[in-house]
Amino acid sequence: MDKSPQELYQERLKRYEDAQAGRVPDRIPIPLFTVDFHARYAGYTLAETVYDGEKLSHSVEKTVLDFEPDCFEQQHTRNLIGHALDLVGYIPEKWPGGEIGDDDPFQYLDMEIMKGDEYDELINDPSWYFMRRMVPRTARNLRALEKFPNPTAFLYHGIVYNLAAFGTPEMKQAMDLMHEVGKLALSTIEAEKNFIRHMANKGFPAQRGGAMVCPFDAIVDFMRGAKGGMLD
């Protein structure tokens, strides 16, 4: 007797969870983890699945249904980012259809973004450091955030005068841009949630709900660069 999608979903999910928890599964689970195979398999360029949500969904669904893995890596928040990266002018990466060819894979550029003498500044206030240092250095269209005021200065009447930075045309442009990118992000998150539900109804669980970056990766890959991080 053929199993229902719901039965297959629970069977695959248990298999994957058992393996993650160190229990012995009924067999080795096979996840589908791909950055660009789904696009090529479905006959799209990489740029099409980076800029077009419908083509991305179709390519991932076709790949999952044809290969029947035990779980799949969700791709919307990973890949459907072309328009948002264009808007912010993201510097440390090149993506299909943006500065490189439509069928060229993502290229992450090894760069020194955080300076070697800025560790104390980062440690003392990571949130302020990222807003005022990292974001302007990685997003050319958000450089106005270099003037972002330190929230600790918002005490008493400081809340008035330390908002002066937001009165400039450059800061307004940056705020408007962040609103537009935020709307794109919300739309992409919703598309991914809908796709996960859609695939669950077909019997396939998503591989994970989130990810973390270890401290070494955060510093070396995304802040100091390989040379700076290794020398540190």
Residue ranges and their predicted role:
Residues 1-232:
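Catalytic cores of TIM-barrel enzymes
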